[in-house]
Amino acid sequence: MSVLLFGASHRSAPVPVLEKLAIGEADQPKIIEHILQSPLVTEVMVLSTCNRVEVYAVVEAFHGGLTVIGEAIARHAGMGMNELTKYAYVRYSEAAVEHLFAVASGLDSMVVGEQQVLGQVRNAYATAESHQAVGRVLHELSQSALRVGKRVHSETGIDAAGASVVSVALNLADNKLDGLPGRTAAVVGAGSMGSLATAQLIRAGIDNLWVVNRSAERARRLAATAREAGVNAQAITLDNLDQALAQADVVVSCTGAVRPVISLADVHHALEGGRQLVFCDLGMPRDVDPTVAGLPGVVVVDMERIQREPTARAAANDAGAARQIVNDEVARYLTGERMAEVTPTVTALRQRAAEVVEAELLRLDGRLPGLAGAERDEVAKTVRRVVDKLLHAPTVRVKQLASAPGGDSYAEALRELFELDPHTVEAVATAGELPLATKELHE
């Protein structure tokens, strides 16, 4: 079994295509469950952000697994497979590992070095785990990716500029409005991106903030945080969006909705009086109706505009050191995986040896029924010691050999030499399949 990645991002597809492909939180469980119906896929995780959609899966066969995943995504997006393949990319085995490590490190982001993707990877894992779609392989892969991402950010200067999609958008808004200090802002969506936007708007010096969200409670919590920072903040639901639009100079929106939440009529009504209004539309799909950009006095900063901004590539100078860390960590991960794959074979061999020892001791009992208990115990200990010593060197060596590229052949040779039952090896591998969730994945 190997890891297969099927995805599309800002590097391979235009925004209109990414909008079709976007998989919202509500749809992710459906996609996961549909893909897992195939016997060719044993684990699956969906990573969907404002500029990428990627499915990571553990598959029994490359071509079969690719067909299952591709068809599931195509059906979700309402696209034909021929159209989808124009924009999709595929990574397998080592290349899939390297890609996820690069993504978690911010190396593949629209804004190189941004850190929000770490939380997005963590959320993708949590969703997959909650739907029993994660086994040992994706657990270890996700844990390693998060650790690598943190290491890159702590050991390199890749995020020294503090850039993110939000900061790039707000810099553009600042330029359009001749400054954000003293302005009134609205944040539509109180999730992680909305929280980040709120924090950056506060640092930019806004005076007033409207927090708009479907859930009034989440909006109130975010507004309370802003008030603690000295900003006059109010929380409203989406039903009252018009109140915020009527007052705001800049609107930052990222709701995760499947269709626009800000319509042409909403904005047209809010613009009465001839004022200027800047929208930072960070949603994928878009939160702001595209026709809004044609209104006088309106500026829409969307993902396509952000992608063209030179600031989004400013951190690339530090990418070399980050890439070296990723390469080193990929090698480390693959070594660990190869050793993990041979471990069930070694364990099955030791179990087989223990069974042989016990069978021979039973034969001894039949031949020497009068053997004293203490003497029998000493014989048993001696036999077990001999077997352990005989097995120690070859099992240690096979783990070492298996850790090198192409080392799976040594485990196969061990199974053949000792006639180990494949079902026994598989049972050993399955037992304790998923370790306890780690702090990396849940903090």
UniProtKB/Swiss-Prot annotation:
**UniProt-listed GO biological process terms:** protoporphyrinogen IX biosynthetic process from glutamate
Pathway in which the depicted protein is active: Porphyrin-containing compound metabolism; protoporphyrin-IX biosynthesis; 5-aminolevulinate from L-glutamyl-tRNA(Glu): step 1/2
What catalytic activity is recorded?
Answer: (S)-4-amino-5-oxopentanoate + tRNA(Glu) + NADP(+) = L-glutamyl-tRNA(Glu) + NADPH + H(+)
Active-site residues annotated for this sequence: 50 (nucleophile)
CDD domains (alphabetical): NAD_bind_Glutamyl_tRNA_reduct (cd05213)
State the source organism's domain of life.
Bacteria
Q: What class of enzyme is it?
A: oxidoreductase
Site (Important for activity) location in chain: 99
Q: What else is known?
A: During catalysis, the active site Cys acts as a nucleophile attacking the alpha-carbonyl group of tRNA-bound glutamate with the formation of a thioester intermediate between enzyme and glutamate, and the concomitant release of tRNA(Glu). The thioester intermediate is finally reduced by direct hydride transfer from NADPH, to form the product GSA.
What's the family? Belongs to the glutamyl-tRNA reductase family.
Q: Could you tell me what this protein is called? A: Glutamyl-tRNA reductase
Name the gene: hemA
